[in-house]
Amino acid sequence: GSTKNILKGERVALNILQRMSGVATLTNEFVQKLNGSKTKLLDTRKTTPSLRILEKYAVTCGGGYNHRFNLSDGIMLKDNHISACGGIKNAVSLIRKKTSFVRKIEVETETLDMVKEALEVKADIIMLDNMDLDTAKKAVSIIGNKAQIEFSGNVSLETIKSIAEIGVGFISVGALTHS
């Protein structure tokens, strides 16, 4: 192409490349903190508009894993869904009636009572959302191997190792792609 056209796109291309490099580097810093652990680092859907596929690719380049690309990739019942349905049992019951048995259902929990309710309805994945470490430790003990466990909320480079040590399978970090 012409020099003029190349120069027009140069800054945009460099900005995108720098952003993705930053995402991959930050992801790798988190992954290094998990070294020796079986816990996997996940991204979230909190991405820059129009850059989701690139940011999620950058996460994998940094050694992390993608959680979901979009809402259709998995069923995650968040606090507002649970409230609207009148509780976890009702929410999961409604979902099971409307979806294939092969779809995994993830339930966001904030308390030990919610964890127990998610276990009663046989949630496939239980997210411990914004729990303090002591409560999360108790939740992991209650869940055992009855469901996969994801920790989310207030995760930093300083806290990720201690979170992994309580036995969660996954830790999701929105800050990887959402600054």
Give the location of each predicted region.
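Acidic/glycine-rich phosphate/pyrophosphate-binding loops and surrounding catalytic core
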Residues: G1-V121, I125, D134-I142, Q148-E150, ...
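Short secondary-structure boundary segments
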Residues: N130, G153, A175
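Cys/His-rich Zn2+-binding cysteine-cluster or related metal-binding knuckle/ribbon modules and their
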Residues: L157
